[in-house]
Amino acid sequence: MWYQGAGAGFDLPYQQNMDLHHGGRRRSSGPGIAGAGGVPLMHFQPTHASVEDNMREAVHMLDLLLPDQRKGFLRLFHQFAQQRQRPAIDWAQVKPLPPELVVQQSDVPACPNDQALRHELLDKVVILKLNGGLGTTMGCVWPKSAIEVRSDLSFLDLTVRQVEYLNSMYGVDIPLVLLNSFKTHEVTAKIIRKYRMHNLTIHTFMQSCHPRIIKDTLQPMPSCPFGESPPNEWYPPGHGDIYQALYASGLLENLINQGKEYIFISNVDNLGATVDLDLLYHIVDGEVDFAVEAIQRTRADLSGGILVGYKGKPKLVELSMVPPERRDDFKKTHNLFNTNNIWANLRSVQRMVAKDEMSLDVTVRERQVNGIRTLQLETLAGSAVRCFDRVLAVAVERARYLPVKSTSDLFLVQSDLYGVRHGTLVMSKDRLDKSVPLIKLGREFSFVEEFLRRIPHGVPNITELDHLTVAGDVIFGANVSLKGTVIIVANEGSVIMIPDGTVLRDSVVTGNLRILDH
């Protein structure tokens, strides 16, 4: 099979512009000079006009962005400016999602066992993985998708195996699309070369790149375009940018012309996000424009989006957006937690973007960069649920949400709790309770290198584990089994080495290896 994307002989991705928009246009290069007309930066000062006018003037005079991206950035800034004047959400209007918009996965009818029908369904599908993040939270400087998860296989390796299996099993050509950011694009282009001879087509494209905003002045941080200013003065504006980026890249039209009708979007680190034929059949049969998979929120789901009803429409609300005084009541009332597994009709997306009707809620995040407080304006892919007419929330089983955000999650997915079949993680039949154990590893385990050093013989047996907390300098031996609730705490300056063959059940282990009933 062939594949397209970044690299020699590939499609031009949206925002290869990372190179083209600063290398393919003339720039003034003298000191203190940037942008259209060679406007001296030192002479540019915000006026007393509105913050929007000042930002628009700065972006144009400094020539920071190409037209498409400039429009997108200024749209987000406009929404941000409005939110400063009045609350973005009238909390009195927030209601539970109407029952008619929610279907339980257990109530979804099975896809008929008809090979021709399944071929027809899968031939309409595109799989897209959000691949814009680095593995920095786990001490890695490369794309998170390249981290090895199971048996020397990375997130990307597992995804490729899943797609290859479907292609071979049903005689289809499901394209795999990777949405990269400027942080992951070049490395990903090199990584995917190893899949040249595999049975799938890979497309890559890159999302937008926006300038950080100085919080005190509400002016752009960079004084010249990307590539001519430090990379940390720029940021990818969230995965809600996917729709505009896919449209602008030309890939959306290309996929539609190939006869593709639905796109399945998910985070590359969610090992539970696989194509489910029953869900696909239900969505296609119901002519759904946009569907979001959600789970029942638990105490472990500390951040993310919640699906609610708002002024008669579905809406995705980030927990961080909820005022502190309302948070407890909000969590008690609303518990449909967004998995970021999304099914969307490609023609509906194309129509909404073309008509400029894909207006997504803005999330404001604050970051410290070089000692300066900055803002970044982001959107979420799931917030598009409010833009479509025929929408659906699918309350899915927890197995469809298995993200790896930390080494605690890595501990879980590398354990004997799961096996791998055709690139998909499958829970062990030895696990009687199908709930997932709660794993809390201390800071000593935070980075992958240290994590692996502390489990040199692999993750302990945890098929009967309910809860594990580890704090301090702890190293696990071979063939260790953890059952029930286990707490291991090494005091500062102490080392706990769990001996080979140890079985801990409902135990607390302290610095001197005393084992107590818990």
Question: What is each model feature region?
Answer:
Residues 127-133:
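ATP phosphate-binding P-loop of adenylate-forming
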Residues 2-123, 281-518:
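Left-handed beta-helix
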Residues 100-126, 137-384, 396, 424:
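Domain-scale recognition of functional cores that engage charged ligands
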